[in-house]
């Protein structure tokens, strides 16, 4: 039928609307993404492509927000290594997310606290990991609301590393 495309579009639009807030289970969000991708494959020249891309972006942002909140939870509960793993996964999964600066910022805070609370034999290595995270934000994102604080942390980390380099 000549209305199949339109029916499929209204179906995915409805599935998209069933996607819950990021704080809830995201099974419906993942399903919506799958269905929108299926629509785009089935109808590559559809008049609904722009709307589908807007829906996809919003759904992906919701998944990224959920993963960022998990990363922040690990940081806030002093689960330093879990936060590092969550950050690595976030960077791999959402490389182009507008939430990337915030994710890097929390990795900086996490690594800074982790280094400060570490045993002496681990401090230099952990301060270097913190400095790497600082540089990742500073180099990849010119001006963010986190830049000033991250620059201060980077400055302190460099001072801490000088102590270990002079031993």
Where are these regions (language model features)?
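Acidic, polar-rich low-complexity tracts and alpha-helical solenoid repeat scaffolds
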Residues: 1-167
């Amino acid at each position: 039928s000549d209305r199949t495309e339109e029916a499929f579009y209204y179906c995915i639009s409805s599935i998209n609307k069933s996607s819950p807030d990021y704080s809830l289970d995201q099974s419906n969000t993942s399903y919506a993404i799958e269905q929108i991708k299926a629509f785009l494959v089935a109808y590559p020249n559809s008049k609904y492509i722009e709307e589908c891309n807007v829906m996809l972006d919003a759904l992906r942002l919701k998944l990224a927000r959920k993963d960022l909140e998990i990363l922040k939870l690990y940081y806030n509960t002093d689960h330093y290594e879990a936060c590092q793993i969550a950050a690595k996964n976030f960077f791999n999964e959402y490389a182009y997310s507008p939430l990337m600066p915030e994710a890097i910022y929390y990795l900086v805070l996490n690594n800074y606290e982790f280094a400060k609370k570490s045993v002496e034999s681990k401090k230099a290595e952990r301060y270097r990991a913190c400095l790497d995270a600082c540089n990742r934000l500073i180099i990849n994102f010119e001006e963010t609301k986190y830049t000033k604080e991250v620059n201060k942390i980077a400055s302190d980390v460099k001072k801490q590393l000088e102590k270990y380099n002079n031993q």
